[in-house]
Amino acid sequence: MEVENINVDAFVPAKKAQKRSAVNNQDTEMQVDQATGIEGLVAGSTQASAPPRAKRIKSELRKVSVPPHRYSSLKEHWMKIFTPVVEHMKLQIRFNMKARQVELRVGPETPDIANLQKGADFVKAFLCGFEVDDALALLRLEDLFVETFEIKDVKTLRGDHQSRAIGRLAGKGGRTKFTIENVTKTRIVLADSKIHILGSYQNIQLARRAICNLILGSPPSKVYGNLRSVASRLSERM
C-alpha cells in the first residue's frame, strides 16, 4: 500500500495568522510613556484626541448678532469683511443666515489667539455703522476701542428736544461731526439716539466731552474753541 505525501500546511486554519496580525497591531499601537512609565494607546489616536479638540474649538469661538437694519448692508459688503479677516488675521468666518449671526473661529494657521477678539471687534464696529475702511483700523492698529452711549445718558430729552440735540451734533451738512472727528482723530456714528465713537482712549474722551457739551446746549463755536485748545496742548506734550 502506497502512502501519499500530504501537505499539512494546507490544513492549517487561517485564524492563527489573523491572531498574529492582531497581536502585531496591538504592539504597534501600544506605547510606554517615558515620563510616567504607563502603557497606553498612542496619542495620535483620533478617539483620544477628539474631545479636547472639540472643547478647544468651542471655547475659541465668537458670535456677533446682526441687527435687522444692518442685514442688507452686511450682505453687500461681505467680501470686504471676509477678505481681511481670513487673509490677514488667518481666522475662519461665516455668516449664519438662520441665526443671523456672524461666527468667527480660530483656525490652524492663526498666529495669535488675540486675533479672534480683534476680528470680533472689527465686525461689531461695522455693524454699529462705521465704514469698512474705518473699522479696518481695529485690525491694523493697537489700543483702539469703540465706545457707545446714548443721549439720555447725558441728559433726558424727549420728542423734538432730542431731535434738535441730534441736529446740533451733526451740524449743517455734517459739519459739526466732521470737525470733532478731525480735531480728535476719531470716527463718530450717530445712530438715532445712540452715539458710537471709534478711536484711542484719550481721543474718545475728548470727543465724548465735546458731544456732551453740545447735548447740554453749548454753542458749536464754543465747543470748537475748547477742542482746538485741548488738541494743541496734547500735541505739544507729544
From Swiss-Prot:
Cystine pairs: none
Predominant location category: nucleus
GO CC entries: nucleolus
Domain of life per record: Eukaryota
Localisation: Nucleus, Nucleolus
GO molecular function, one term: RNA binding
Name of the protein in question: RNA-binding protein pno1
